[in-house]
Amino acid sequence: LIRLKAGQTHLLDDIDHLKNRRVRLSGELIQTQFRIGVNRLERVVKTRLNDPTVAASFFPDPTEQALLARQAKKRRAMKQTKTGSQLTRKLHATGRTGHSKEKLRQKSNDIAVNSRHARWTSFVRTSVISSTMREFFGSSQLSQFMDQTNPLAEVTHKRRLSSLGPGGLHRDRAGLIVRGIHPSYYGRVCPIETPEGKNAGLVGSLASFAQINADGFVMAPYYKMQKEQIRPNTQGFFLLTACYEDQAVLASGDVNLAKPRVSTRLRRAFTEHAPKKIDYLGLCPIQFMSIATALIPFLEHDDANRALMGSNMQRQAVSLLRSERAFVGTGLEGRITRDSGSLLVAKQTGYVTYADAQRIEYVTPKDDPTGTQFKLIAHSVELESYHRSNQDSCLHHRPLVEANTWVQKGDCLADNTATFGGELALGRNIFVGYMPWEGYNFEDAVLVSERLVFDDLFTSIHIERYDVETARLQDGQEYFT
């Protein structure tokens, strides 16, 4: 309280600070839902146990149970005496008395176990847990179909952060403060990429190098600075949480350390310090933005609103019939396609033995510690051929390797519909003229060449599924015409 009286307001708790927020991953959400299902099952079991008719079948009266046991024992003894003599004569004739007795005893034990299992399965209904999990995956606000429009949309959807859902905020009651950009977002949450409309500021995306620790806090990587020199560790960098950042002086990865004073951040404030006062240095300039925003060339010259629109519109680009690599890129096109999982790469260096539109086969040498044997391991990679995605677009692989050729570890084996040579290819490179043309492009109108249509430059394939039902009527079976 004395420090607050002195004006040290940085000691106040900030609800929007990332040190006071944690990320609940999908595994934790599923675990919580499974716990709800187990609790429901417990209540169902307790309810059925309280039912006298149900409980009597599992916990009968001891006196009655003893009487029933004696009667059952007498019946078994009489039955064994009656059938034992006949069975013994047959077994002695064949010479397999001991083996058949053991088999008969095992069969009776199995029948007893199955009867007890049948009683408990009719008593404990696992459908309660199944319906709870189905409810989460089918109707939860945080359960969505993966966006498969292009590889960038897949990666962005997997790295999305949402403040909505159970235990979160409501879009109609969230104000401007909670939607705003907090200084602790630097290097953790992208300040640019967010939806337009009611979800603005409530749904975001992880920064390019951000990671989430076991406690659910978002961490950002930094280089440790000591005497104006980078002090590496085993990883080469340090991962800092937002709570630890408040105690250090941080600088961006593109500052000029030769200047007497550089721009820094300290306790959520942007200030200036001498280079020797810097505690941590950022990795690179794109550290604070998401991967979709990092794909925009010359982002520093863009307006903030246009950068936001460009980040969202890239995810809406439909895969074309003929893809083409962009002339101007940022260097992340190849890494995004590999991280999305839609690109097929060689796991080891090997020799391609067979390649067609359906599969690619290659062999790799097996490591032998003794060095006396040479063995080959065969690998087969299945290719997708005109599969329908969640957005009714086309998922197709084109092989890039031929038979009787060598491939290195990490080489691209096949392209998909949104890649070219292993790099992301969203759209085509076209020549654009910014000029009037006899009034045809008045205001926001666009005049295009007929080559865009006849040469299929922007032609895409869509696969849709339609279900038609037939019924069996009194007059006969319906059929398609």
Predicted regions and their residues:
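Short, charged/polar, low-complexity loop and linker segments
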Residues: 10-12
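Short active-site loop/helix that positions an aromatic residue
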Residues: 210-214
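Long, charge-dense accessory insertions within large macromolecular proteins
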Residues: 19-76, 81-84, 90-95, 100-193, ...
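Active-site diphosphate/adenylate-binding microenvironment
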Residues: 6-7
